[in-house]
């Protein structure tokens, strides 16, 4: 009987500490703001950062996500990083990908 009481008391203490820790971590996550007005985007000079539009040829994509996947594949074939993909316009960055490991 004594071990049951001791075990249940210990279990209650552990569970209460765990619940306090999870509430604290949840409240910290809520304080992070993803609002663009609070965190303005980085001001990049896009003319210098991105070259001209990349022409992918015939695109078989039905939506923007599929088009951007084709854009990323196109940039990787040219050993470049995907710069920007918006409104069915593909830009590969000027940054090249290293060939060897």
Curated annotation (Swiss-Prot):
Main location: secreted
Localisation: Secreted
Keyword hit for Disulfide bond: yes
Keywords tagged on the record: Antimicrobial, Disulfide bond, Fungicide, Plant defense, Secreted, Signal
Signal sequence, start to end: 1-21
Disulfide cysteine pairs (residue numbers): 68-85, 71-90, 75-92
GO biological process, one term: killing of cells of another organism
Annotated GO CC locations: extracellular region
Family: Belongs to the DEFL family.
Protein name: Defensin-like protein 222
């Amino acid at each position: 009987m004594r071990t049951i009481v001791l075990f249940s008391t210990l279990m209650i203490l552990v569970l209460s500490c765990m619940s306090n820790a999870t509430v604290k971590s949840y409240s910290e996550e809520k304080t992070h703001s993803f609002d663009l007005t609070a965190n303005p985007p980085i001001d990049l000079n896009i003319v210098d950062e991105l070259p001209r539009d990349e022409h992918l040829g015939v695109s078989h994509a039905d939506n923007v996500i599929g088009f951007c996947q084709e854009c990323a594949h196109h940039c990787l074939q040219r050993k470049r990083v995907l710069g920007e993909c918006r409104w069915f316009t593909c830009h590969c960055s000027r940054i090249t990908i290293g060939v060897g490991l």
